[in-house]
């Protein structure tokens, strides 16, 4: 079975910075794109997607008194290649998608509140625009003849760093973490 479709939803993202300099909060963004799915065996198949993902993080400088003293927003083109597994019948299915995720940074923007103390990474460009990680998630879908309507949540742990990580650099780790919740619509071709 071959399926093509569209997906869209919300993303919740943050960054792991080691050493930790400030408290960080999640940033809410959007994501969406197109998907292709091939079911080769009962209950198993492959799925590839091409998405645009908004990610980033917020920081609260201790003692600043504001909810956010710094914010970094990233826009990435995103390519997850997933093992697709499902259980259920021809009408209602539970789904599980797991696999690698490759992303490339399209743009980056920063906001630093006046009076905040600039830190090492404030104003620093992203050193590694190509990002890779592992994604996994699950959800449910409804099959109505050739049409599939679904809802899925995913977690991505990026294993690559945004900033250089040599001994002489500022950070040992600077990896993104992203949670997405998407609705999708697919059409079975054959």
Question: Where in this protein do the model-derived segments appear?
Answer:
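Extracellular loop and loop/strand-boundary signature of outer-membrane beta-barrel proteins
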Residues: 18-22, 64-70, 119-126, 167-173
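Predominantly the C-terminal beta-signal and adjacent terminal strand-loop region
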Residues: 49, 126, 131-190
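Residues that define the transmembrane beta-barrel architecture of outer-membrane proteins
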Residues: 2, 24-30, 73-79, 92, ...
């Amino acid at each position: 079975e071959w399926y093509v479709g569209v997906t869209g939803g919300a993303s919740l993202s943050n960054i792991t910075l080691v050493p930790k300099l400030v408290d960080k909060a999640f940033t809410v963004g959007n994501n969406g794109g197109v998907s292709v799915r091939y079911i080769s065996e009962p209950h198993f198949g492959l799925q590839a997607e091409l998405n645009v993902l908004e990610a980033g993080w917020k920081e609260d400088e201790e003692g600043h008194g504001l909810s956010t003293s710094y914010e970094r927003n990233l826009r990435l083109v995103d390519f997850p290649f997933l093992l697709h597994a499902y259980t259920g019948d021809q009408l209602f299915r539970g789904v599980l998608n797991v696999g690698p995720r490759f992303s490339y940074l399209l743009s980056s923007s920063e906001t630093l509140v006046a009076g905040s103390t600039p830190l090492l990474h404030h104003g620093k460009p992203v050193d590694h625009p190509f990002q890779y990680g592992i994604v996994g998630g699950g959800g449910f879908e409804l099959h109505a003849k050739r049409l599939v309507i679904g809802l899925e949540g995913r977690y991505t742990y990026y294993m690559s760093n945004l900033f250089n990580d040599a001994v002489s650099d500022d950070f040992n780790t600077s990896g993104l973490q992203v949670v997405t919740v998407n609705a999708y619509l697919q059409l079975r071709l054959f």
